[in-house]
Amino acid sequence: MTTARPAKARNEGQWALGNREPLNPNEEMKQAGAPLAVRERIETIYAKNGFDSIDKSDLRGRFRWWGLYTQREQGYDGSWTGDENIEKLEARYFMMRVRCDGGAISAAALRTLGQISVDFARDTADITDRENIQYHWIEVENVPEIWRRLDAVGLRTTEACGDCPRVILGSPLAGESLEEVIDPSWAIAEIARRYIGQPDFADLPRKYKTAISGLQDVAHEVNDVAFIGVNHPEHGPGLDLWVGGGLSTNPMLAQRVGAWVPLHEVPEVWAAVTSVFRDYGYRRLRSKARLKFLVKDWGIEKFREVLETEYLKRPLIDGPAPEPVAHPIDHVGVQRLKNGLNAVGVAPIAGRVSGTILLAVADLAQQAGCDRIRFTPYQKLVLLDIPDDKLDEVVAGLEALGLQSQPSHWRRNLMACSGIEFCKLSFAETRVRAQGLVPELERRLADVNRQLDVPITINLNGCPNSCARIQVADIGLKGQMVDDGEGGSVEGFQVHLGGSLGQDSGFGRKLRQHKVTSDELGDYIERVARNFVKYRGEGERFAQWAMRADEDDLR
């Protein structure tokens, strides 16, 4: 009788276990040359010699660490999406992402963002659901001048993309909200100062998303690491630590570590969590390299043990969980601030603005004495410090720009990714489609809009990567090519229903074989919204209703 040998553990490329040999092309690229070092080549070689001079490993790899992706070549529908068509899909222009840690900028910075758009990006500008600004049509020759202008107002594109710490989400009303438990602005600024652009964390296994807020207004459940305000019964205000969230093709909600962290320790604890990811994260398969996979395999108890014993060298303080919220906190509308002034939050459709609009908003802000502008994780824009005697003027001025502070449910609660207009991964048009879909829904569902006392969130994404968080929307729409009924395929969406964060956190449900074409979106959303109003129970939220509703009412 022979005894079977135990299976040898697969090498997942974990540095802490001595596995430094790169196991995929992306890891090979990083080992061959530090991605952050490409900035010098951009400034001294590529910007001078043009697009054709760019080395492919820089173009498709290291450029990301400076917020640059090539955008999609025009004229190719979703049937062309895929790595095998990269040579056709790769345009000679770039998407550039500007990170705004905490979503916070000054009026001067907003003006600079607007002018860069007008001068170099064909007047494009989109507010993302990570509080960034994204440009399109950027030429490599203009990148050094754009960087110079951003540097002058305290903004940067450093690590806005790539396997590194992305922009840090923060509350748009941090320090001024009457509802926040604590103002963590110092921690956000300190993490950005100490660690962003530094080599220690510039080579992580995969992207790494952070959210820090005294309110639950940053979608913390879908971030790799998050600190959320909570009151400890003995120690007072602090932050509750969460790890391992993320969506894409394997969605997972973050888990509570069960630790209360005082404000002054947040940067240290953030660095320790990031170090665990850097050293133990999986580097073999890109599709399983996010922190969430390590947390899932280890379990939260082991994660906390390693964090405390190997990195912090001390135990964390046990703490209570924050009370989950019923609905997204998007800061749209007029709110009174701690300082006695007002915040005005507005809802551009799916975050789409323009350089011209940003310049006009900067004018309005400066005329009202406002020097604090915020972007939100829901693709919204907020102006702080508006005095009472300027409030009507600012609200009217924003309204004239198409930026409503009292929008319909459909305008307020719809988000979208870049879509096939610019993204090489997309199968469907999303942000552009949203510009027509929202007015259509406002016309068709004006009566429902008046009846609704709860939001219905609608998130459009062009591919499975879920940049627009489809799995946690009431109605999530994932772009794909769908059967046209005549043996061909057309642009369409797979439907996810009843996803939510907060009280009903979860990914909802998919209906078997249920897909809609892009042309059917208005009809489908109207049908489901009317069924919700007709069949919901007293006080019932959409996510609750969708989980119990008959399939026929959801189709």
Curated annotation (Swiss-Prot):
Keywords: 4Fe-4S, Heme, Iron, Iron-sulfur, Metal-binding, Oxidoreductase, Thioether bond. It comes from the Bacteria. Disulfide bonds: none annotated. [4Fe-4S] cluster binds at C417, C423, C463, C467. Residues 1-31 are annotated as: Disordered. The keyword Cytoplasm does not apply. There is a cross-link at Y69-C161 (3'-(S-cysteinyl)-tyrosine (Tyr-Cys)). InterPro entries: NIR_SIR_4Fe-4S (IPR051329), NiRdtase/SiRdtase_haem-b_fer (IPR005117), Nit/Sulf_reduc_fer-like_dom_sf (IPR036136), NO2/SO3_Rdtase_4Fe4S_dom (IPR006067), NO2/SO3_Rdtase_4Fe4S_sf (IPR045854), NO2/SO3_Rdtase_FeS/sirohaem_BS (IPR006066). It catalyses: hydrogen sulfide + 6 oxidized [2Fe-2S]-[ferredoxin] + 3 H2O = sulfite + 6 reduced [2Fe-2S]-[ferredoxin] + 7 H(+). One of its GO terms (molecular function) is metal ion binding. Siroheme binds at C467. Monomer. Belongs to the nitrite and sulfite reductase 4Fe-4S domain family. This is Sulfite reductase [ferredoxin] 2.
